[in-house]
Amino acid sequence: MVGMDIAKYIDHTNLKPYATKEDIIKLCDEAIQYGFYAVCVNPYRVKLAKEYLSEKKADVKVASVIGFPLGATPTEVKVFEARKALEDGADELDMVINIGALKDGDYDYVKRDIEEVVKVAHEKGAKVKVIIETCYLTEEEKIKACELAKEAGADFVKTSTGFGTGGATVEDVRLMRKVVGPEMGVKAAGGIRTYEQALAMIEAGANRIGTSSGVRIVEGARNAE
């Protein structure tokens, strides 16, 4: 896979709490230069990223995060956060499921939590990726989380926040793809730093990669040609 091709899989990400305005502009410039699908930034930085990319007439989407990174805020708070991010120009929302509720077996709550965010996003033509945070889940819980995200109408399931105890694995991506089938997206994120790692995730079924190492991955793809 050539660099240009793999770039279109990448959400070029900076979710560091200390990311400055300059850091976000650099992220956007790299996304333009390398042709990444999207930038992924914290909600506070959505407006800046959207305005900057619009000024540059760039074909780069803006993704943001909801209930991040713990997923433990009430649904009403996630909905408020989602509305604000959409208002500021987000094209996609990566929301964290309520992991505790999932482990409680309160599947109605988990599903409704996702549904409410999906509803406000889809009203604005935005997509929702549901982060299940695989590092904290058993295989059964991973399967259930994917099923609930699919039932709730989400567009993608996503492995990880990158802030947990582990990131994406090929095995988890393969399992998630098997559960959601071909009609939903699967985003691999967390610890993906090389072209070889990104390619392995894509071969396992991911059709989006979340990484802060997008430049390195594309350069690696070019070197592999």
Swiss-Prot record:
Q: Which UniProt keywords apply?
A: Cytoplasm, Lyase, Schiff base
Compartments in which it is found: Cytoplasm
Molecular function in Gene Ontology? deoxyribose-phosphate aldolase activity
Q: What are its GO biological-process terms?
A: 2-deoxyribose 1-phosphate catabolic process; carbohydrate catabolic process; deoxyribonucleotide catabolic process
Known EC number: 4.1.2.4
Can you tell which superkingdom this protein's organism belongs to? Archaea
UniProt-annotated catalytic positions:
94 (proton donor/acceptor), 158 (schiff-base intermediate with acetaldehyde), 187 (proton donor/acceptor)
Matches recorded under InterPro entries: Aldolase_TIM (IPR013785), DeoC (IPR011343), DeoC/FbaB/LacD_aldolase (IPR002915), DeoC_typeI (IPR028581)
Coarse class of the primary localization is cytoplasm
Record-level GO cellular component terms: cytoplasm
Coiled coil (UniProt feature): none
Q: What class of enzyme is it?
A: lyase
Q: In which pathway does it act?
A: Carbohydrate degradation; 2-deoxy-D-ribose 1-phosphate degradation; D-glyceraldehyde 3-phosphate and acetaldehyde from 2-deoxy-alpha-D-ribose 1-phosphate: step 2/2
Which reactions does this protein catalyse? 2-deoxy-D-ribose 5-phosphate = D-glyceraldehyde 3-phosphate + acetaldehyde
Transmembrane helix as UniProt keyword: no
Can you tell me which family this protein belongs to? Belongs to the DeoC/FbaB aldolase family. DeoC type 1 subfamily.
| Record PANTHER family | DEOXYRIBOSE-PHOSPHATE ALDOLASE (PTHR10889:SF1)
Protein name, as recorded: Deoxyribose-phosphate aldolase
| Gene (name only) | deoC
